[in-house]
Design a protein with these regions (language model features):
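Phosphate- and other anionic-substrate recognition elements at nucleic-acid/protein interfaces
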Residues: 1-178
Length: 178
């Protein structure tokens, strides 16, 4: 199974994970998408096109996108523009996708719904050995959530609280796993 995790922001983090042996997660590719100097609808169009052209070319079984966070009202409009461009590109491409709220991501990775970015980075490294930017680590957690949901054989590797959140998230997105 191939899963893409996306952390929408002005530097959108992405991580491709595969379950290659039924026992571990394999990082295919990771990075950030940004368009310095572009603003507004030009940036929205560029992000949507990049998602269609580059990332969807991997033909993922599932894409997990971080849901909208409402903590910073100053960046909310920009994040909604970027998030909408990503979701529209996925919809137009017919790629199955699901959203995970920021608190769900944090609880899955760390067991705490209010973990800061540097804490998420540390937890991702400790549990899975992945190092990257804060955006890439969020994307890793999202991709891992989707991969564990789609590959029950990986489930024993999770802690009890991770398993609980995973099963609740999977129930919310059951249409993707039937």
């Amino acid at each position: 199974m191939k899963v893409l995790g996306l952390d929408p922001s002005t530097k959108t983090g992405f991580v491709w994970l595969e379950d290659t042996d039924g026992e571990s997660l394999h990082v295919v590719q990771s990075g950030e998408i940004s368009f310095p100097g572009e603003k507004g609808m030009t940036r929205v169009q560029s992000i949507g096109q990049r998602i269609k052209d580059d990332l969807i070319g991997f033909q993922p079984n599932l894409v997990v996108v971080e849901g909208y966070g409402f903590a910073n009202k100053h960046t909310l409009v920009t994040l909604v523009e970027i998030g909408t461009a990503i979701r529209l590109a996925l919809h137009e491409s017919g790629i199955p996708w699901a959203s995970a709220a920021p608190t769900q991501l944090k609880k899955f990775v760390s067991g705490k719904g209010n973990m800061k970015k540097d804490g998420i980075m540390l937890e991702v490294y400790k549990q899975w050995g992945f190092e990257g930017t804060d955006n890439e680590c969020d994307a890793f957690g999202l991709a891992a959530l989707g991969l564990y949901a789609g590959c029950p054989d990986l489930d024993p590797h999770l802690k009890a609280d991770q398993r609980k959140l995973l099963h609740a998230w999977k129930a919310e997105n059951l249409r993707l796993f039937i």
